[in-house]
Amino acid sequence: MVQKHKNLKTLRFAKIISYIFDGSVLVLPVFLAICFYGKQNLAAIVPAFLTAIIFTALIPYMAILLLYKARKVSDLQIPKRKERLFPLLIINTCIVAGFFVLIYMQPEKLLLSVYMIYLLGLPAISLITLFWKISFHASYVTLFSIVYLIVFGKWGILTIPLILLVGWSRIKLKRHTLAQVLGGIAVIGTISLTVFYITGYLTTDYRAISELSWLLRSSSDYMNLVLPGFGLTLVFILAYIFLQIY
């Protein structure tokens, strides 16, 4: 009885995590960070910020809500792969339309770069989900973490554990397998890093990357001492998680 109650609490916590880190929710902190952190002329940024939010979150979420009320989808997070096609068509159309609006507005380079990741990443994940249930949650939280690393430098490292937390929640709720979570991380991670590399944000000339590079170099001696033990511990932890899941 106690074990059952504990399991219910764990499932409830996993569900809360899934809702908090839903893609439509994470859009707001992503664009808030890139649009307003360290900026001077905030009023000039607001139109582009609102445009990005409207086309990546507001319209797609309202469309899914209407589909849910019309009973075209059984859950707001659309866990059933067969129900995803029409909502994804709407969302991808919104993303493409928003891109052309943003091009006309000529936003800052970082905002356009992040929007490009949505423009390339969402269709890629949408195509994959037609035959394999890749994790959208894992994709979105990975993008969130990478953006925060680009914007906030070393402080962005604090967001990396969120990827593990969200991945755990999706597996715990049995919405995805470990492979599907890792797939979401890999796809959006690759696209994000490629876009940021092409647009010049992955060089040490950029403040955040320079800061991260310095942090890694300054801690290298310490890591040389602790990494073998840490690596062995990590292997045992991953083995334990694998055995628990499978």
Regions found by a protein language model. Name each.
Residues 1-14:
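Short, Lys/Arg-rich, polar N-terminal cytosolic tail immediately upstream
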Residues 34-47:
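Short, hydrophobic transmembrane alpha-helix segments
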Residues 108-245:
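Membrane-embedded catalytic cores of phosphoryl/pyrophosphoryl-handling enzymes
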Residues 4, 69-73, 240-246:
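Membrane-interface capping segments at transmembrane-helix boundaries
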Residues 29-33, 54-66, 88-102, 161-164, ...:
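Hydrophobic core of alpha-helical transmembrane segments in multi-pass integral membrane proteins
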Residues 81-86, 98-114, 224:
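Transmembrane helix-loop-helix
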Residues 74-91:
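Juxtamembrane helix-capping/reentrant segments at transmembrane boundaries
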Residues 17-37:
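The first (N-terminal) embedded transmembrane alpha-helix
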